[in-house]
Regions:
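Conserved non-cysteine loop/helix-boundary elements of the Radical SAM core domain that shape
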Residues: 1-104, 113-130
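Residue-identity detector for glycine
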Residues: 3, 51, 82-85, 107, ...
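Intrinsically disordered, low-complexity segments enriched in small/polar residues
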Residues: 11, 107-109, 170
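Glycine-rich phosphate-binding active-site loops on the catalytic face of alpha/beta enzymes
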Residues: 107-112, 178
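AMP-binding (ANL) adenylation modules
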Residues: 110-115, 150-151
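Terminal RNA-binding accessory module
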Residues: 121-185
Length: 185
């Protein structure tokens, strides 16, 4: 791994998080304390209909364990809102989950049917307007979480990987281990 400064783990399904992986992340200095967990939802029924192999409680346990074992870990996730049959109650369960878990980074996609997938023909497709409202609600909540997280970083000294100089400015562009290129902006 000579010449490589940082290794970042992206798109790691929650069920793939083992004690061994946690130890490697914790002990290998080149592996960023950053993990992208595509959880998609937090309601057990929706997770099952999506074909996911974890439950809400397992997700809570994984996030809790990661934060306990690696206190400075940056956790990122992606969610899908408006999956066929998603009720307002199931959506609110997802909102509460996001509020409780306080992910450092979070993206929300609205469900869109893909040809030849089981979900494309499921009953109770959600109206586009409802999907967009749900997405906006989750992103507004995440903005609050992101603001709180950023406030906690004030005064911290962090290693920054410089990516380039800003043209015609006496400044540079860089990122910390908490910022994945092309994912976190």
């Amino acid at each position: 791994m000579s010449g490589i400064q940082w290794i970042r783990i992206l798109y790691c399904y929650p069920e793939e998080i083992t004690d061994e992986l946690i130890q490697v992340i914790k002990e290998e200095p080149k592996i960023c304390h950053y993990l992208d967990l595509p959880i998609q939802h937090a309601n057990d029924e929706i997770l099952k209909r999506m074909g996911r192999r974890t439950s809400k409680q397992e997700l809570v346990d994984i996030v809790t364990k990661l934060r306990k074992e690696i206190p400075d870990i940056c956790l990122r996730t992606t969610l899908i809102t408006g999956f066929p049959g998603e009720t307002e109650e199931q959506h609110q369960e997802l909102v509460e989950f996001v509020d409780e878990m306080e992910f450092d980074r979070l993206g929300v996609f609205t469900y869109s049917p893909e040809e030849d997938t089981p979900a494309a023909t499921m009953p109770d497709q959600i109206e586009e307007e409802v999907k967009l409202e749900r997405q906006a609600e989750l992103m507004e909540l995440q903005q609050e979480v992101a603001f709180d997280t950023a406030e906690k970083m004030i005064g911290r000294e962090m290693l920054v990987m410089i990516e380039g100089k800003i043209a015609d400015e006496p400044a540079y562009v860089g990122r910390t281990y908490r910022d994945a290129p092309k994912v976190d902006g």
